[in-house]
Amino acid sequence: MNLWLLACLVAGFLGAWAPAVHTQGVFEDCCLAYHYPIGWAVLRRAWTYRIQEVSGSCNLPAAIFYLPKRHRKVCGNPKSREVQRAMKLLDARNKVFAKLHHNTQTFQAGPHAVKKLSSGNSKLSSSKFSNPISSSKRNVSLLISANSGL
């Protein structure tokens, strides 16, 4: 009886020390359900997205939007009109950033690299930028109080 108990203990210790082998494969980070409803205010704050295809343990086609605040993810139905609109917005935004990044040059100044914009005209129209003075009542009141002191 003692020999049988000793064999079970040895087998138990060897099983605990042996590395675990997972037959399931790689862990997949995927959406299992859609967030509903997703507001346009949330979708336009996303900084990027990716399309989830149906494969492996991910059994739902989805658009995963990555939000900058607290590294949150929002899963949307890729057939939804708001989700498609947000994907087009992000594609256009990334295209503009890629063009701006293409127009930069890197100069080596000592141990630090400095990026400098090219001397060419900017591709962004001036209508994209709002006037900071007219957009905020606080800025207007600051200008009035600064001018009254003259």
Curated annotation (Swiss-Prot):
UniProt keyword annotation of Secreted present: yes
Tissue-specific expression: Specifically expressed by thymic dendritic cells. High levels in thymus and small intestine.
Location in the cell: Secreted
GO molecular function, one term: chemokine activity
SMART domains documented for this protein: SCY
Annotated signal peptide: 1-23
Keyword Secreted included in the entry's annotation: yes
Gene3D superfamilies on file: 2.40.50.40
Example GO biological process: eosinophil chemotaxis
Disulfide bonds: C30-C58, C31-C75
Any Gene Ontology CC annotation: extracellular space
UniProt keywords, alphabetically: Chemotaxis, Cytokine, Disulfide bond, Inflammatory response, Secreted, Signal
Function as written in the Swiss-Prot or TrEMBL entry: Potentially involved in T-cell development. Recombinant protein shows chemotactic activity on thymocytes, macrophages, THP-1 cells, and dendritics cells but is inactive on peripheral blood lymphocytes and neutrophils. Binds to CCR9. Isoform 2 is an antagonist of isoform 1. Binds to atypical chemokine receptor ACKR4 and mediates the recruitment of beta-arrestin (ARRB1/2) to ACKR4.
Protein name, UniProt field: C-C motif chemokine 25
